[in-house]
A protein has these predicted regions:
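Aromatic-rich peripheral "rim/lid" segments of glycoside hydrolase catalytic domains that contact
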Residues: 35, 215, 224, 229-256, ...
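Bacterial N-terminal signal peptides
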Residues: 10-21
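Beta-strand-rich domain onsets/edges
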Residues: 27-89, 109, 121-122, 129, ...
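Substrate-binding cleft and catalytic face of glycoside hydrolase catalytic domains
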Residues: 111-125, 140-274
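Active-site-proximal loop/turn and secondary-structure-junction residues that shape catalytic pockets
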Residues: 86-88, 116, 182-184, 227-231, ...
């Protein structure tokens, strides 16, 4: 009878999940092939991992026996984030307020822009504090320009001065991640034009890392020390960073990645993590490169894994259950699990560091495809024990300067899309613990909840109302 009841309960849970998916996304959002890829067995595995790895047991004592106790989770240990590059740049007070509220109502982490060419456009002149082009009033005045026009005209577009953003994060309990100390794409012209020797160029990199570490200190919890440096066409058994994948014509000193981690290890404050970040995470050469760096002494604390889909057609293929996209792969559960398993061999926590999953079109169907895809992806990533942080990239549609993609949680008019509501359901409801319990004869309550901070309220042993704070780890 127990087995039968468990079986019926399992069927009931699957039916509820199917009903939720149908209600949220509609019957025709995804193909039967997609639903087979992400079917009940995959969802059950995800649920089991979430229960095992994202929850912990807790006991709270000191209540009057046999009385009601309310357990309420306040914060998550797990970091849910996005980049905050459009801070005060969205053209109206209402839009800017909605953008900021995302980081207080939905998310608890932010990636802060430190692109060298905009941070130090002239040698020695750092854009720490807000300037004339960092005010909401300025961006309100150019709101009619396209994202591409803003990017081409203003070095500050999607690159706001970081100090005010760090202040915003600190005031609102938002964990800040610095992106990035060294990134060849954002190398300032004054570095490139100086045409230094390799040794001199690496010296400039080291000095820049020192400046950032000293000025920012512990206001960020971690840095992408080097971003996207592996040479993609290098053999897996001999990975290197001699040519940047996006611009092979620009010189880069051989071995600069290792030198940068050497410098970061010397100057980053205690407790600030050194991350590496890369786009070609499905390719074996990236993880081979990270292992090579670590074998040569690089102190890499965090492995960043990007998952971008910069193509509407690829999203259509994903909805159809495709196993291959335009880059030779598609984000199927099996492929993602294989990538995470390979990353785990490095023995470091993984940061799902940049995510772009667009709606293939600006229609209810397109938004439903985006929402269901991200629901499945977030659930898989959240369930994986080595993943501790998930960062979405562009929160608002059509704010990325190179691609016309409806990839945000908000439409261009700051309307909350289906994906916002789906992730809000996961983060603020499904993955938050709220319980009504009764204290045991010894005055304690026991429960299993998601890791984070809690408020526990009831009647104390002295008969008076009491409130206790708790960290469930």
């Amino acid at each position: 009878r127990v087995v039968t009841m468990k079986f019926l309960l399992s069927l009931s849970c699957c039916a509820v999940l199917a009903g939720v998916r149908m209600a949220c996304f509609g019957a025709d959002a995804m193909s039967s092939e997609y639903r087979e890829l992400w079917g009940p067995s995959v969802q059950a595995e995800i649920d089991a991992r979430i229960e095992k790895h994202r929850k912990a047991d807790a006991v709270v004592a000191g209540f009057k026996p046999g009385t009601a106790v309310e357990v309420e989770q306040l914060t998550h240990d797990f970091k849910f984030g996005a980049h905050i590059f459009n801070f005060d740049q969205l053209g109206s007070r209402e839009a800017n307020d909605a953008y900021k509220a995302t980081f207080t109502n939905l998310l608890n982490a932010a990636t802060v822009a430190y692109y060298w060419s905009s941070y130090e456009p002239v040698k020695g002149r750092f854009r720490h504090a807000a300037g004339p082009h960092d005010t909401a009033a300025f961006w309100d005045g150019v709101a009619a320009l396209s994202a591409e026009e803003k990017y081409n005209r203003y070095v500050e577009y999607r690159r706001p001065a970081p100090d005010p953003i760090l202040d915003f994060c600190a005031a609102n309990g938002i964990d800040a991640h610095g992106h990035a100390m060294i990134y060849r794409v954002s190398q300032p012209d004054w570095v490139t034009n100086a045409a230094p020797t390799d040794a001199e160029q690496i010296g400039l990199y080291r000095a820049h890392i020192r400046e950032l570490a000293e000025h920012v200190g512990t206001r960020v919890s971690q840095w992408d020390v080097v971003n996207e440096s592996v040479r993609r066409d290098a053999p897996v058994d001999a990975p290197d960073d001699t040519v940047f994948w996006g611009d092979p014509s620009r010189h880069v000193p051989a071995g600069y990645t290792l030198a940068c981690y050497d410098e970061a290890a010397k100057c980053l404050p205690k407790g600030v993590g050194a991350a590496i970040n890369e786009a070609c995470v499905i390719d074996d050469v990236y993880l081979a490169f990270v292992k090579s760096l670590m074998d040569r002494g690089a102190k890499i604390d965090i492995v960043g894994l990007q998952f971008h889909i910069f193509n509407a057609e690829e999203m259509v293929g994903l909805a159809k259950g495709a196993h291959k996209g335009r880059r030779g792969y598609c984000y199927t559960p099996a492929r993602i699990k294989a990538t995470l398993e390979k990353a785990d061999r490095l023995g470091r926590p993984s940061h799902i560091s940049e995510i772009t999953v667009p709606a293939p079109e600006e229609t209810p169907w397109g938004e439903a495809v985006q929402a269901e895809a991200l629901r499945d992806l977030y659930r898989l990533w959240f369930s994986w024990p080595s993943v501790y942080r998930i960062t979405y990239w562009n929160l608002v549609d059509f704010t990325y300067h190179k691609e016309s993609l409806a990839s945000g949680f908000y439409g261009r008019d700051m309307r909350k899309k289906a994906v916002y509501h789906v992730l809000d359901r996961l983060i603020n409801h499904d993955w938050k613990t709220r319980l009504s319990l009764k204290s045991s004869p010894d005055g304690s309550v026991s429960f299993r909840g998601f890791r984070g901070t809690y408020r526990v309220r009831g009647i104390g042993a002295d008969g008076q109302p009491c409130e206790k704070s708790l960290n469930v780890r």
